[in-house]
Design a protein with these regions (language model features):
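Extended, low-complexity, turn-rich repeat/linker tracts enriched in Gly/Pro/Ser/Thr and Asp/Glu
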Residues: 25-38
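Extracellular/lumenal carbohydrate-interaction signature centered on repeated Trp-anchored short motifs
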Residues: 8-19
Length: 338
């Protein structure tokens, strides 16, 4: 038997560490089905849908005996809301289970696949069970389900209350940022300027919420130079050739694997078999953009004949420019389960 309630809401849970919820269960007043502790359980599902891609955590319910209880008494509160019924878990139990499932899936004799429910008991709370099916992600939780499951072989009737489902314990691993600039004037030959900017994962402004902090490392630097090529020729040539060149590079290295967004990229790299596979994932994960610009503006030779003519070199100018942009990174993902 199964009873449940649903909520649709897109949420990124990666910036939190724990998931909590109170649960209360009691037999109905007439108690005709005679339920006992552990015969029913409460569970919560988090995923992109309710059936094919979700994490699940299940807790066997301890029943509160019939009676009158004092809401101001801590001992009575623990009877009504038993610790055994409380959901208080690290969100990492889900991603740890995903790692184990994915490792088991690599063994063709295991029978494990994305399409089959994979379950283990919680090592810290051995009565509770953790499950996964498909490829859910805590980065994109679109559906939440809270349900009650009858684990006995007969009909059972109970009253269940759940309260204060919440995320807690922000990930307080902060980041840092820095930037620098340098300009050099080379007399009348030209100038050189350089700039750099770094922001690491976890960095955010004072006005930003936890969910708005960076989830990647960002590196950017730029080199720019302008100089007058004519200064390197004899004055008699009267050459004017202003040259401009710039080079910039931006690199974004995500904290999480872009192919599996609630798994740390470093863990995904460690799980790969060889350097070739690791380099391939890095090339996909890291987004790198480079710009190269070169221009020669209004180059002219200021030489004219004694009797000015239309075809004098000083009457002509030439300009040339070229811009090159190169992008590297993830552009398309398609994952299929055979």
């Amino acid at each position: 038997g199964l009873g449940d309630v649903y909520k649709r809401q897109t949420m990124d849970m990666r910036q939190y560490r724990r998931l909590k919820m109170f649960a209360h269960a009691a037999a109905l007043t007439d108690n005709v089905t005679d339920p006992e502790d552990g015969q029913l359980s409460v569970f919560i599902r988090l995923g992109s849908d309710y059936r094919s891609n979700f994490y699940e955590y299940e807790i066997p319910l301890k029943l509160t005996p019939a009676g009158h209880y004092n809401g101001d008494s801590e001992s009575d509160q623990l009877i009504v809301w038993p610790k055994d019924n409380m959901l208080d878990i690290a969100l990492s139990v889900f991603t740890d289970l995903k790692k184990k499932r994915n490792q088991a899936k690599n063994n063709p004799l295991s029978g494990v696949s994305y399409g089959k429910l994979y379950s283990e008991y919680d090592s810290e709370q051995p009565a509770n069970k953790i499950s996964i099916i498909g490829n859910p992600s805590l980065a994109e939780v679109k559906t939440m389900m809270i349900g009650v499951r009858n684990n006995s072989r007969s009909k059972k009737s109970i009253e269940v209350w759940v309260n204060e489902l919440r995320l807690s314990d922000f990930d307080e691993d902060g980041g840092w940022a820095a930037q620098g600039n340098m300009n050099v004037q080379l007399s009348d030959l030209g100038s050189v300027s350089m700039a750099g900017h770094v922001e690491t994962a976890g960095f955010g402004g004072l006005e930003q919420s936890v969910s708005e902090r960076r989830l990647d490392d960002y590196y950017q630097y730029q080199f720019t130079t302008t100089f007058e090529l004519g200064r390197f020729f004899p004055k008699a040539v009267k050459l004017s050739a202003p040259i401009y060149y710039s080079y910039s590079r931006e690199k974004t290295s995500p904290k999480y694997n872009p192919l599996d967004k609630d798994m740390l990229l470093k863990d995904a790299l460690d799980a790969l078999a060889n350097d070739r596979e690791r380099d391939s994932l890095r090339n996909i994960a890291n987004e790198i953009t480079t710009y190269k610009n070169f221009s020669l503006s209004n180059m002219r030779v200021g030489v004219t004949s004694k009797n000015p003519m239309p075809y004098d070199p000083g009457n002509f100018t030439m300009s040339y420019s070229r811009t090159k942009r190169h992008n590297q990174g993830l552009s398309l993902i398609h994952i299929s389960e055979p």
